[in-house]
A protein has these predicted regions:
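Conserved SAM/SAH-binding beta-strand->alpha-helix loop
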Residues: 10-11
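Core SAM-dependent methyltransferase catalytic element
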Residues: 110, 114-139
Length: 139
């Protein structure tokens, strides 16, 4: 039940998604062609934005997070899944890791409130925020 939006900035990845969904008979996933600043989500439409090992790659993180927040329903959640910078034993280059503090600083100007950090994964943390009714800071 519900709709899942699969967002990518590469049309070929959305074509692959569609092919896989068609083969599996999955009907509730919609591919969305986003941009480097905007995931192009319908306003106030999503309960959860899940970003797995991607946020650190954004060239325009402020704008992207602002637009993700616009797509979230009030009380909706954002989950950042990123390799733990705090753990030197995680065999990933530093530029592909984020600390919890970094993620929290990125979220601060936006209408987001920290909910929890889940450390159950062996190399990544899941840092969860919920959308508040506050207005984001504009740059």
């Amino acid at each position: 039940k519900g709709t899942v939006y699969g967002v990518d900035i590469q049309p070929e990845m959305l074509e692959l998604l569609k092919k896989n969904l068609d083969q599996l008979g999955i009907k509730n996933v919609k591919g969305v062609l986003g941009s480097i600043q905007d995931p192009k989500l319908p306003p106030n439409s999503i309960d959860l934005a899940l970003m797995v090992d991607v946020y650190h790659e954004f060239s325009h993180p402020y704008e992207m997070l602002q637009n993700i927040c616009s797509g979230l329903k009030p009380g909706g959640r954002i989950a950042f899944v990123e390799y733990r910078m705090e753990d030197p034993n995680v065999p990933i280059k530093l530029l592909h890791k984020m600390s919890q503090l970094q993620v929290m600083k990125e979220a601060t100007p936006h209408p987001l409130e920290w909910v929890e950090t889940i450390t159950a994964l062996p190399r990544q943390h899941i840092i969860v925020f919920k959308k508040t009714s506050a207005t984001p800071v504009t740059r």
